[in-house]
Swiss-Prot record:
Name of this chain's protein: Periplasmic nitrate reductase
EC number(s) reported in the record: 1.9.6.1
High-level lineage: Bacteria, Pseudomonadati, Campylobacterota, Epsilonproteobacteria, Nautiliales
Swiss-Prot/TrEMBL cofactor(s): [4Fe-4S] cluster; Mo-bis(molybdopterin guanine dinucleotide)
Biological process annotations from GO: Mo-molybdopterin cofactor biosynthetic process; nitrate assimilation
Organism: Nautilia profundicola (strain ATCC BAA-1463 / DSM 18972 / AmH)
Known partners and oligomeric status: Component of the periplasmic nitrate reductase NapAB complex composed of NapA and NapB.
Database matches in PANTHER family: PERIPLASMIC NITRATE REDUCTASE, RESPIRATORY NITRATE REDUCTASE
Gene3D superfamilies to which the protein is assigned, alphabetical: 2.40.40.20, 3.30.200.210, 3.40.50.740, ADC-like domains, Dimethylsulfoxide Reductase, domain 2
Pfam families: Molybdop_Fe4S4, Molybdopterin, Molydop_binding, TAT_signal
Length: 937
């Protein structure tokens, strides 16, 4: 059979499409498809990108991935991918892939911070890395070093990193970029339920009849989930109702039945309006509320997570905004919102007296009458006035929408499914707004039920599975345990077989504070894993300058030369997703594993290998000694009593354990491909056929045991019996993921509901359906809206909290700006690119589809400024400025007074402009709001 390229592409595409829908395939097309796939080895894997957790199938031939398709057996995506998903393979084959360690050196071959990058051996790289680490570790102690972790870590990578940093170095200065995306959601879960992660699952999409999308452009950021929402809507167009609530019009608006454009930060006011309406309409599910909830509130004067304005690093331009960290003038609209507290009037100066330490977290139980009093000022007239976000929409129209919103939530015959992502989480009151959406659902009793619940969507592929569940945050340990809890530290030390007292009880620096600590000279050695912090952190000019000009040493694990790699002193080339074994956990608590499919290029090695190899460089006597700076005693005597010699390395104690070698040999039957029976490679366990000279100067041949399985089986023990139960390693390689807790081989779809959750059945009272069994923060003092009144704490076992939190104005609201910064700036992602674009900008098809970041602007604003479409403009804030081209007809349509600039483009490094204010509870940065000027370049 003879066939040209065009005919071949046509027939293979037709064959694939026909097969997908069950149509018989012409023999010629079938033969063409079979010929081209000869010798391909298929295996299941997980998408590298967002937190949806789509299953994919990858095909390998001659040690290269030659095809990717959606996994038809995946219950998440059911065989389809989004545009990024189809290019999972191409991200690995960019022309400038890093394949050798690179160290800044002078002409003499010595490390020089101002030198040029030159290739070095792995041994030379680790020698310099060790030298610099020990210099600063001995100078500053455990608090002087840090690791920037990731929500894109595999679970095993994150677990190994936590062991090295917290058990090995006795530092808690490890924090993931998930701090930027999910920390507010975590605080909302902890504060409300006492345990992290969503109660529901993706099945809710098809079961519900009402979807509320709050600050979540699902059509671009979670496109596969949006396709499921779309399908459900099209199958039941008259009943299924979608509301899109956003600060600008986006692609979700196209399908939505109603769109509400609100003023940035005013979601707080809308939630309070809903709370008031639920009471006024007698829509409270009193049986649910009385049995399963209590009411609570906390302090309002908590600041905005900014630096002290007296810091020498705060510039004159920044100071007026940063001053609000200490005190602010209460506006007239805030005076109404805060009036139930009875402390502040319009024009008063609010001193931020509850900013330090745990004070922003303090909360106490209040009565229902106090709660009712608190929401009373949030009338339709008041909220419509403060919350309307589109100047061109009439007030009456906005009011009608708010009333319809309340109708939908309060309708007893409707289910209610609320989704959100960064619009809630990246928010100066992100923890509050998370608490308030639960307030609405709990009052209605529409929580933890099929089709009804408040559902936080995750942005990254393992922000849940690794960052949160493993505990790669500065304050966490595995399975929702906390470094500040003596009982939790003791459990962890026992599990890790390390001396009692090894773990540092003091919470480490969060992601943004690590940057500030580098600028302050408090941290002088930092290691970046699986993220791009010098592009993804707000107020980037400060952090880039500090990294490049101060006395410090920055190591970056990278696959491509992005912004952070170019800022670094040492770059370590690392494997990408299908060049290593791994596991991710997605937004519905589904854990999924994959096998290594291909060999990494050049000398690139897995992140896990770099962590374990670096652990060989530390003897116990160097790290488990006394650290006066951190007030940590020596645990060497206890270590010797456990049989550990001070000359042993952290590798010996943490990773190269005898039980690992005995119980998890390599090769392992689970590593055989289900289709061909061939053994998959495992770079860490047995080498991968390359001749790699390792960190010790010897040829790398593997650890000789199944590292990933050993780490998994140890890690999963943390959650067994504690409502975080995970299945064994082999099971995950036989299924398309499981939603934890996995008890007796069965996954859990809806948590806290005794009909579906074995832990809810265990803890619920006889005859009751729900038990909110999370153990954290389940004893509170009692008081009123002004503060706690009792010294005693009262148990809230198995109950959730209904919070009241007030509306407050953002610290950089253009409405109150007197310096000419008259536009809101919002930033975020786009469909075609992932985060900082380091991977996706190297895929030709994705680059062509979206080659640069644009400044999306309302046409009326553009006309007023004398701007035409695609004109080059300057977007300037108090912190910095960038140039971008104006787009007035694009997919994102801001109201007048707001511009949207995505952050995937390092040439439009918008984080130089963004404000580094955070939610004071979660420490998550508010990337969605800053005051800017826009003018022609």
């Amino acid at each position: 059979m003879s066939m040209n390229r065009r005919e071949f592409l046509k027939t293979t595409a037709a064959a694939a499409a026909a097969s997908a829908v069950g149509i018989s395939i012409p023999s010629e097309a079938k033969a063409a498809a079979e010929n081209t796939q000869a010798g391909w080895q298929w295996d299941k894997a997980v998408c590298r990108f967002c937190g949806t957790g789509c299953g994919i199938m990858v095909a390998v031939k001659d040690d290269k991935i030659v095809a990717v398709k959606g996994d038809p057996e995946s219950p998440v995506n059911r065989g389809i991918n989004c545009i990024k998903g189809y290019f999972n393979a191409k991200i690995m084959y960019g022309a400038d892939r890093l394949t050798q360690p690179l160290l800044r050196m002078n002409d003499k071959g010595e490390f020089d911070k101002n030198g040029k990058f030159r290739p070095v051996s792995w041994k030379r790289a680790f020698d310099e890395m060790e030298k610099q680490f020990k210099k600063y570790y001995n100078e500053l102690g455990p608090t002087g070093v840090a690791v920037f972790g990731s929500g894109q870590y595999t679970i095993q990578e994150g677990y190994a990193a936590v062991k090295l940093v917290k058990a090995g170095w006795r530092s808690n200065n490890i924090d993931p970029n998930a701090r930027h995306c999910m920390a507010s959601a975590v605080v909302g879960f902890y504060q409300t339920f006492g345990i992290d992660e969503p109660a529901g699952c993706y099945d809710d999409i098809e079961i519900t009849d009402t979807v509320f999308v709050w600050g979540a452009n699902m059509a671009e950021m979670h496109p596969i989930l949006w396709s499921r929402v779309s399908d459900a809507k099209l199958n039941n167009p008259d009943k299924y109702f979608i509301v899109n609530l956003s600060t600008y019009r986006n692609r979700c608006s196209n399908l939505a039945d109603m769109e509400i454009i609100f003023r940035p930060n005013a979601d707080l006011a809308i939630m309070n309006y809903l709370g008031r309406e639920i009471l006024k309409r007698n829509a409270v599910n009193w049986d649910f509320v009385k049995k399963h909830t209590i009411f609570a509130t906390g302090h309002a004067d908590i600041g905005y997570g900014m630096r002290n304005p007296n810091s020498p690093h705060v510039t004159d331009k920044e100071r007026d905004t940063v001053a609000k960290q200490v005190a602010k003038v209460v506006t007239e609209e805030e005076a109404v919102a805060l009036s139930p507290i009875g402390k502040w009037k319009a024009g008063d100066e609010m001193q931020m007296t509850h900013t330090a330490g745990k004070k922003p977290f303090w909360h106490w139980q209040i009565s229902f009458d106090d709660f009712k009093k608190a929401v009373e000022p949030y009338t339709l007239d008041y909220v419509a006035k403060v919350a309307k976000g589109d100047p061109d929409e009439s007030l009456d129209s906005f009011k009608r929408k708010l009333q319809k919103l309340a109708d939908l939530y309060c309708d007893p015959n409707r289910k209610a499914l609320s989704f959100w992502t960064m619009g809630f989480n990246q928010h100066v009151r992100g923890s509050w707004i998370n608490e308030l959406v639960y307030m609405v659902h709990l009052l209605l009793g529409k929580q933890s039920q099929p089709g009804s619940g408040a559902f936080s969507l995750t942005g990254q592929p393992s922000a849940c599975g690794t960052a949160r569940e493993v505990g790669t945050f500065a304050h966490r340990l595995p399975a929702d345990m906390l470094v500040g809890n003596p009982k939790h530290r003791k459990i962890t030390e026992k599990m890790w077989k390390i001396p009692e007292g090894t773990l540092n009880p003091k919470v480490g620096s969060h992601f943004l504070k690590i940057m500030r600590d580098i600028e302050d000279g408090k941290i002088k050695w930092a290691w970046v894993h699986v993220n791009n912090p010098w592009q993804n952190t707000a107020n980037a000019n400060h952090w880039i300058k500090a990294a490049r000009t101060m006395d410090n040493f920055i190591v970056v694990n990278e696959a491509y030369p992005g912004v952070s790699a170019r800022v670094a002193d040492l770059i370590l080339p690392v494997s990408m997703i299908y060049e290593k074994w791994g596991a991710y956990g997605n937004a519905e608590r589904r854990t999924q594993h994959w096998r290594q499919q291909v060999t990494p290029p050049g000398e690139a090695m897995p992140d896990l290998w770099t962590i374990m190899e670096f652990s060989k460089r530390f003897k116990l006597k160097e790290v488990w000694k006394a650290h006066p700076q951190a007030k940590l005693p020596s645990v060497l005597d206890k270590a010797q009593a456990m049989g550990y010699d001070p000359e042993m390395t952290l590798f010996d104690v943490l990773f190269n354990r005898p039980e690992y070698r005995k119980n998890f040999p390599w090769p392992d039957p689970i590593a055989k491909n289900p289709q061909t029976g061939k053994l998959h490679a495992n770079t860490e366990a047995g080498g991968d056929g390359r001749t790699i000279i390792g960190a010790d100067g010897k040829e790398w041949k593997g650890y000789g045991f199944f590292v990933h399985k050993a780490l998994w089986e140890e890690y999963r023990k943390f959650g067994l019996g504690h409502a975080h139960d995970l299945a064994d390693f082999d099971t995950y390689h036989k299924v398309r993921g499981l939603r934890w807790p996995v008890v007796n081989g069965k996954e859990t779809k809806w948590r806290f509901n005794a009909e579906y959750d074995p832990y809810a059945r265990k803890y619920a009272k006889p005859g009751e359906k729900f038990a909110f069994y999370g153990p954290l923060l389940k004893a509170l003092k009692r008081g009123d809206l002004k503060g706690p009144k009792t010294k005693q704490k009262y148990s809230l076992k198995n109950k959730a909290k209904i919070f009241w939190r007030p509306f407050m104005v953002h610290p950089e609201d253009p409405k109150y700006d007197t310096k000419g910064y008259n536009f809101w700036l919002c930033t975020g992602r786009v469909l075609e690119h992932w985060h900082s674009g380091t991977m996706t900008m190297r895929v030709p098809e994705l680059y062509r589809a979206m080659p640069e970041a644009l400044c999306y602007m309302n046409p009326k604003d553009a006309k007023e400024l004398g701007l035409n479409r695609f004109d080059l403009v300057v977007v300037e804030s108090r912190r910095g400025k960038v140039k971008a081209r104006v787009e007035t007809r694009g997919r994102n349509k801001p109201p007048r007074g707001l511009v949207y600039v995505p952050w995937f483009d390092e040439k439009v490094l918008i984080n130089k402009v963004c404000l580094d204010a955070t939610c004071p509870l979660s420490k998550e940065t508010d990337y969605k709001k800053a005051a800017v000027k826009v003018y022609k370049a």
